Swiss-Prot record:
Subunit comment: Component of the Mediator complex.
Originating gene: MED9
Subcellular location: Nucleus
The UniProt record lists the keyword Protein biosynthesis: no
Major subcellular site: nucleus
Descriptive protein name: Mediator of RNA polymerase II transcription subunit 9
Species assigned in the record: Drosophila pseudoobscura pseudoobscura
Lineage start: Eukaryota, Metazoa, Ecdysozoa, Arthropoda, Hexapoda
Amino acid sequence: MELSPNNQIEDRKPILTADGLVQTSNSPFEPTISQETQTSNGIGTQCQLTVDQLDIEILPIIYDVVRCVEKDPLENAVKLRESQDCNHKIFELQKRFESAREQIRQLPGIDYNKDEQLQRLELLRNQFKLKQQLIRKYKDTEF
């Protein structure tokens, strides 16, 4: 643990780079402690979600909206009530879309563009290969 220039504690973990060197500073792909501190202090109130934790259930509401639009009542009073119900269901669908957008914004890595994600993936693959090689090397060594 080290102190940053603004006197916040930063946890700098050693990282094995693709060329086999150990890097102690945070990479541009990992959040710094100050970003995590902002989140824990309530400045950024988002928490990290996984794809499995997403609660995006929009198909039943879309089905209800389509059913509502397909109805064609003959009486004006019934038409008005059906129209209000349809507007309510559309508003509910809009709320679900907004909720889905908020949840997707909380996914880790969503703020990286495609090139950054591919670069990060390649780096992780190289780290994985290096770790596999180290494991094989130490398995073969006798103590």
